[in-house]
Amino acid sequence: MVSSNLALQLEVTTQPKIEVQESPVKWCSVSLSDVVSRGIRLEASVFDVEAKQAREKISKGIYGTVALAGDNGLIETAYYPGWIQRSRLKRIYCDREYGEGFYLPSQMTDIYPKPEKYISRLADCDMDELRLKKNTLLLTRSGTIGSVAYVSKTLDRCVFSDDVIRITFKEQYDLGYVYAFLKSKVGNLILRTNGYGSVITHIEPGHLEEIPVPNAPIELRKRVNDLIVRSYALRDE
């Protein structure tokens, strides 16, 4: 009797319900021309869904878009040392007393950057071309691409490698405005991908012509720029 009751209890015992949390499906539409341009490849990895959605958000925004670079773009100049000559910087490292402090691209966002190495003044390169200039926007073009920094008092005249793109703008107020956009999740995602949404491993100045930026009113751009400039001024103190 006891054994039969035990068997009955085991039989009617409810099994614990296991809930599987499903990840939301990521999707986007892809034009036929994009598919053809990508070698008629249909793998999802070829088209970064979030990157394409980011571009769609910008294109459908209330302000419309303007190109970051190009004839009608916001940028005046975008270059890195040796870009025109297509040559790499030849570095000669030395002790502190014989050279210039040399900063790594990863240090351009540091609050108190200190040179990791020293480059000899005898190196076959234009040292002035390597020095950063105040009121310039910086982008890392290789390695960890897409890092963005603003050259204020702290970085002014510091020597950085050719792995950093230097950018100036036609209108000064666009400096802080574009900085804020490229630091945002949407802006940085667009910066690190191409027009098809694929992640790129290297940024050249020409890539900036493919970057859409919200064409906000000038007064809003000026306000954003002023806030960025003030924030960096406080960091410099």
What do these predicted ranges mean?
Residues 145-152:
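Short, Lys/Arg- and Gly-enriched loop/turn segments at beta-strand edges
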Residues 1-91, 217-237:
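Non-catalytic DNA-recognition/assembly elements of restriction-modification systems
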Residues 70-91, 106-134:
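Sequence-specific dsDNA recognition surfaces
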Residues 144, 163:
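A generic "binding-loop/recognition-motif" signal
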Residues 97-102:
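Short, contiguous, well-structured surface segments enriched in hydrophobic/aromatic residues
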Residues 1-17, 109, 134, 153-157, ...:
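Basic, amphipathic alpha-helical recognition segments used for DNA target recognition
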